[in-house]
Design a protein with these regions (language model features):
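Intracellular juxtamembrane helix-capping segments at the cytosolic ends
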Residues: 52, 131-145, 353-366
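Interfacial helix-cap and linker-helix signal at transmembrane-aqueous boundaries
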Residues: 52-53, 84-85, 166, 170-178, ...
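Conserved MFS/SLC helix-loop-helix module at the cytosolic interface between two early adjacent transmembrane helices
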Residues: 76-115, 307, 313
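C-terminal transmembrane helical hairpin of 12-TM major facilitator-type secondary transporters
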Residues: 284, 290-296, 302, 307-361
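Cytoplasmic helix-loop-helix junction between adjacent transmembrane helices
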Residues: 121-158
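Helix-loop-helix hairpin linking two adjacent transmembrane segments in secondary transporters
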Residues: 156-208
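Extracytoplasmic gate region of multi-pass secondary transporters
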Residues: 45-49, 241-300, 389
């Protein structure tokens, strides 16, 4: 479907050696853009919820359920995408995902019934964006960096915040002036524009251009996953089976389930609608999310720096604790300008700040070879939590007429996750790595 990953682009890069080892940061920049656009795609249903409701008369719980399907498949695709990147190549996997994302989004312009929404924005965009997620960042970090991994993962995790920062005000303005169709068009074009950028600038791995990982010596040999030599599907499931027999996996899975439940599942999907119930317009509510995005960009980058230096378990405890208190505060805030700014700052600082310490704990427990795939399954837990919250929030709104109880429950689960984080122990490997093929 796509040209071999080392011809001709990697040959040209190898001949010119642009930036030396620092070319790793060029790759990070391109992947950051991919993650940013994927975050914009995943945040679009929050802006489209009211326009779709007004345009088609669809109930909010139905629209929320479609968004939840997309979030769920986004997460479940991740671990298979991580193994597929090892089996057929990162470039091919990423390019195919961008094609699916752009195509399914554009196809939704023709939708007239709820099942069309489920197919385009639920199934296909969920699967397509699943490979352009945290597992992609984890794979890039392990392939391209020997040092500064926490900082780089923090930067790439912050792309979710930047996606909100860049896309939400734009698509909210488009939705307010023209309905849901301009939003769909903008997302489809932005996704399609990344395809040639990835093809031109992202080699398969440092060795493809005659380099080693950033911060590594010339004789560095990066770890290779067994998925690159065998059945990637079997390896992905076998890694899950082995990881599921360990306590540390379930602690990480549970806390990341709560992370998804309390971020893109509830706040990302329902905050704009919650603000609408309180008399705040879509553009103003999107501006609030953008402000949160600014502080998350700061908080997640700082979290990556802190993860390289401090106990990640304690960091997670602090992050989840602050998040829980913020969510409990919001329903009682009065939704004044000052109170919403306070919420945006406190909540925004740790929106995605949990990713760098969670990845470090996964790599410490399961190793560099299995770590990204295990992390993919942990991210699946995140998205199961997010999908649950997306559907739960819409159902609570239909049953009670407001979102207050949904946000209070989410806050309490975050505080529980803070306590669980302190129980995680990665002082010894969770299981022995599989033998590496010769």
């Amino acid at each position: 479907m796509f040209p071999p990953c080392n011809v001709p682009v990697s040959n040209m890069i190898a001949q010119s050696h642009p930036f030396g080892q620092r070319y790793a940061f060029v790759v990070v920049g391109v992947i950051f853009l991919c993650l940013l656009v994927a975050a914009g795609l995943r945040s679009a249903p929050a802006v489209m919820m009211l326009p779709l409701e007004n345009s088609f008369g669809w109930r909010r719980d139905i629209i929320s359920l479609a968004a939840g399907v997309g979030i769920l498949l986004y997460g479940l695709t991740g671990p298979f995408a991580a193994a597929l990147m090892e089996r057929i190549g990162l470039r091919r996997t990423l390019l195919a995902s961008l094609v699916v994302m752009s195509g399914s989004t554009a196809l939704s312009l023709l939708m007239t019934k709820p099942w069309h929404l489920f197919i385009t924005w639920g199934v296909f965009s969920g699967i397509g964006s699943g490979a352009v997620a945290s597992v992609l960042g984890a794979t890039i970090v392990n392939r391209w960096f020997k040092t500064n991994r926490g900082l780089v993962m923090g930067l790439m995790s912050a792309s979710s915040a930047s996606g909100m920062l860049v896309f939400l005000p734009l698509i909210a303005a488009l939705a307010q002036s023209g309905g849901w169709q301009p939003v769909v068009t903008a997302v489809a074009i932005a996704t399609a524009a990344l395809i040639p950028v990835v093809w031109l600038l992202v080699p398969e791995r440092p060795a493809s251009i005659g380099m080693v990982r950033y911060g590594a010596e010339a004789d560095d040999v990066p770890p290779t996953s067994p998925a690159s030599q065998g059945n990637f599907l079997a390896h992905t499931l076998n890694t899950l089976r082995r990881a599921a027999g360990t306590r540390v996996f379930w602690y990480l899975f549970a806390t990341f389930f709560v992370c998804g439940f309390t971020t893109n599942g509830l706040v990302g999907t329902h905050l704009i609608a919650f603000c609408g119930d309180m008399g705040i317009g879509e553009v103003q509510a999107a501006g609030l999310l953008s402000m949160m995005g600014i502080f998350d960009l700061i908080g997640t980058t700082l979290s990556g720096w802190l993860t390289d230096r401090y106990d990640p378990r304690k960091l997670l405890g602090v992050y989840y604790g602050i998040r829980g208190l913020s969510l409990i505060y919001l329903p009682y805030s009065g939704f004044s300008a000052t109170s919403l700014i306070i919420f945006a700052v406190l909540y925004g600082l740790d929106w995605i700040a949990t990713v760098p310490p969670t990845l470090r704990l996964a790599n410490e427990a399961f190793g560099d070879r299995s770590g990204p795939i295990v992390f993919g399954w942990i991210v699946a837990g995140h998205q199961i939590g997010a999908a649950t919250a997306a559907a739960f929030g819409g159902t609570m709104r239909e049953l009670q007429g407001n979102y207050e109880l949904a946000f209070l429950i989410a806050g309490m689960t975050a505080i529980a996750a803070a306590c669980i984080s302190l129980l995680i122990n990665t002082s010894k490997p969770a299981f022995e790595p599989e033998p590496q093929a010769a």
